Amino acid sequence: MRFGWWENTVVRNLDYREAWAAAMRRTVDVEEDIGCEPALSVVRMGDTTAATASIAQIPVRSNARGWELTAHPSLESRRVDGAWREIRDLAEELVIGRTQRLMVHVEGPWSFGANVEYRGHALLRDRPAFRDCAVTLGEAVAEAAQWWSEAMGSAGNPAEVIIAVHEPRVAEVASGLSGSTDFDTFDPVDRQILAGVWERFASQVQRPMVLNTHGPLDDGVVDAVGASEWEAVVVAPEQLQSSAAKDRIGQLIGTGQRIGWALGSVEVTAGIEGGESTAVKMLNQWRQWSFEEAMLPRMVDVVVPEGVRTKGEASEAAAAARIAVSSLVKG
């Protein structure tokens, strides 16, 4: 399944109505031919952990280190719930009929378990509690995706919904998560267990999913990716700086895994020139891997990396991604 490109952008200093309008100008109301239907990202809030907890109706409250489970909804939980209601209401007003493909961004179970505390420790430390939350999360994301599909589609033609799973802390989980104190440590999680939790999540959600770890993929995470199923896995620019890292990604592609090529720090701010530069880099690297050039547009999407941006910065980054994909599609 091709996506062409997608963005991992939180736009600051915009209300949700403006954010929806700007997102459609970046994604839907464009001239570039990317060879497939673009995926419009559902407007995001600044904190993915809190937004994901709200989707799952898991009550949390903030503490000095981040978030912790609570027995009853906190003021922060209610505020995020209200934001989601506004985002959905505006989508029904502004988005219906404009696109048939949407991307919903959520935090993955491993990073959620690392970012949320339970009884003073990372949720991961309590296996039954982590399992219950992970299962609840999977069920809730499935329900949310169903709502977006039905609400944004038309009679007999539901919208396609892709789930962008953000796992910024999975590398820490795989290598041994640090606790709230020097004496609070968490053993490394085996790659098969990593993959197993992802597979259970996927079986619940039943939607195309893309994985974003917000950084390089080490051996353990790559093995877990290979043992699970993702439509695409985001590859950070720094992942392609060493021969060993390039080989690791090349081997992953060789197994049939599609990747999302994240724009570099220079290209993401350079608009059209950044897109043209990215297309050249992608083609050169593809040739180094010795894959057939005709496979490149089918196996690689372009991704705007995770970031908080102004409306102008978001537009520049999206333009770079669209130009890169369009250049590759045109050959």
Give residue ranges: language-model regions.
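Active-site loop segments of alpha/beta catalytic cores
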Residues: 136, 140-243, 247-248
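Conserved, mostly hydrophobic/aromatic
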Residues: 104, 141, 302
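Well-ordered, non-membrane alpha-helical segments in soluble/globular domains
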Residues: 16-23, 79-90, 131-144, 187-201, ...
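Active-site-proximal beta-alpha loop/turn segments in soluble metabolic enzymes
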Residues: 120-133, 164-187, 215, 264-272, ...
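Catalytic-face loop-and-helix region of soluble metabolic enzyme cores
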Residues: 231-331
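Anion (oxyanion) recognition and catalysis
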Residues: 96, 203, 253-254
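Alpha/beta catalytic barrel-like cores
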Residues: 1-107, 111-126, 130, 227-229, ...
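Structural motif
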Residues: 7-14, 107, 167, 211-217, ...
